[in-house]
């Protein structure tokens, strides 16, 4: 039976932890120059309605390193951009490729694509979730902190797809998470409610320094996500003070690490000084998109 990677809570804790183990193994093999062609002869179709640097490069390179091939398709270059129903696209693509990664706006659209496809679907990002990124983040924490489930995590900024994904992660892995957002910019209510039912240890605040106090991991994202450019000025005013900077770091654990999914708007949600500090592991984090996604693709498509 085919399996998809749409949202963390669709998978079991054991399955998610197996991805970390496989990613670490594939990363070690890549660093050692050992071939690991687990997807030889396989093709990944990559559907993009949102532009990207890290998502496209990491999936394309990942398929190459796994011995397969990746096919880039933008919405403007396919019939989806002209109104072809998702259920038709899913069934047609299922006859051509062995898996689909989609980066788009609507989570419902991704779930519909998965419903009608007979091949694995990977959520490369929606406005609701970014599961590949949060798994890369946690792989990075594991590399730097080891006992990642015993740490306190802090999210500062917008209650966006990354915040939603971190709440899902807290529900699945059981760690403590504090989410600090301005009033009116909280995470999605359905995500909050589901995490509560799953027993997640998540605290929601409007004070970033209180959220950061003693935290082992500080994390943030841009104040205005793709598609929200017209709200930039309004959001800049609302998010003033919700920044990772020297004061935030001083409030956290002395050995804290800083995460950011990138691209960063330096001196907005995070200062240039902070992102260049010894606490920041953002480029390890960016690299780990490659390794965790290879593990996801190998698990679903091998």
From Swiss-Prot:
Q: Where does L-ornithine bind?
A: 161, 221, 225-226
InterPro entries documented for this protein: Asp/Orn_carbamoyltranf_P-bd, Asp/Orn_carbamoylTrfase, Asp/Orn_carbamoylTrfase_sf, Asp_carbamoyltransf_Asp/Orn-bd, Orn/put_carbamltrans, OTCase_ArgI
Pathway(s): Amino-acid biosynthesis; L-arginine biosynthesis; L-arginine from L-ornithine and carbamoyl phosphate: step 1/3
What keyword terms does UniProt attach to this protein?
Amino-acid biosynthesis, Arginine biosynthesis, Cytoplasm, Transferase
**What is one process in the GO biological process aspect for this record?**
arginine biosynthetic process via ornithine
**What reaction does this enzyme carry out catalytically?**
carbamoyl phosphate + L-ornithine = L-citrulline + phosphate + H(+)
Q: Which GO terms describe its molecular function?
A: amino acid binding; ornithine carbamoyltransferase activity
Q: Where does carbamoyl phosphate bind?
A: 52-55, 79, 103, 130-133, 261-262, 289
**For this protein, what is the EC number?**
2.1.3.3
- Where does the protein end up? Cytoplasm
According to its record, what are the GO cellular component terms? cytoplasm
Q: Which family does it belong to?
A: Belongs to the aspartate/ornithine carbamoyltransferase superfamily. OTCase family.
Its function, per the record, reads: Reversibly catalyzes the transfer of the carbamoyl group from carbamoyl phosphate (CP) to the N(epsilon) atom of ornithine (ORN) to produce L-citrulline.
NCBIfam families from the UniProt entry: orni_carb_tr, PRK00779.1
What name has this protein been given in UniProt?
Answer: Ornithine carbamoyltransferase
